[in-house]
Amino acid sequence: MAEQIDSLKHENRRVEVVIPAYNEEKRIGRTLDALTVLPEVDAIIVVFEGNDRTPEIARQYQKVRVLKAERRLGKGGAIKKGIEEARAVEKIAIMDADLPVSPENFRQLLRIDDADLIIVKRNFANITKTRLMLHKGFKLLTKLFFPSLMWVGDFQAGVKVMRADKAKEVLNELIINDLLIDVNLIYAFKRRGYKIREVELPYVHDEANSKISKKLLKVIILMFLSLIKLRVYYSPFKGILSWKLYKKAEQRIIKALS
């Protein structure tokens, strides 16, 4: 991972936003336009993967630091790298590149001070029936695997806000590199006894540019396998994940589904 831009001052950085960006040239500009003007946001880390103009666009913004991955990290890997590199002393936020909530509602989340992790329950403005059905099915399956998360109304919303110190503390538990990172993160906070608060907000789903919709079946299979992996990690059988045979099989599956 090579750091491309870091012209920002290190001190007094209260809030940083981490944006995982895989070929997001069509959407990243609008998102950075909205976030860089917010007085609460001191810096933005764009973790870039791919081969489009995303870094070139991001470099135009003074608050933005671009981290360019030398290999494919996946959304989870990009988020972990962003948290690791963040220097905020108060809060670290995670935001999808399509700006799924309004700047006003994002500011509302940043003002909440009585929780270690703030997650969003999506009130969808536009979503297909198929995606909604899959969303509900995934939520049910996740709760069967992790009963202590039965109260969670939504795992996959593309915006979360965390206390910076707590985010750093759970880093070594974040083992998922794909889209299941949200469940991994929430459960890591929950099992440590950190306070989690869920806020319902209007949510805009960008179906036209959604990478998930274009390979939905592969994503479903990969997330199901990652759910099993996460459950095994938090079980007496955790050692299986370090077996060479398991690692080799995992790499082959990921390659086949990518």
Regions flagged by a language model, labelled:
Residues N23-V37:
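Short, well-formed alpha-helical segments that are part of the catalytic scaffolds
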Residues M1-N12, K26, E173-S258:
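Hydrophobic helical membrane-anchoring modules
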Residues R13-V15, T36-V46, K63-V64:
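Short loop->beta transition adjacent to catalytic acidic/histidine clusters or analogous donor-positioning motifs
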Residues K26-R30, D52-Q60:
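Acidic helix N-cap motif at the loop->helix transition within catalytic regions
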Residues E70-L73, G77-E85, K91, P103-L179, ...:
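Acceptor/aglycone-binding surface of glycosyltransferases and processive sugar-polymer synthases
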Residues A21, V47-E49, A69:
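Conserved sequence signature across two-component system core domains
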Residues V47-P55, L99:
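A conserved acidic beta->alpha catalytic loop
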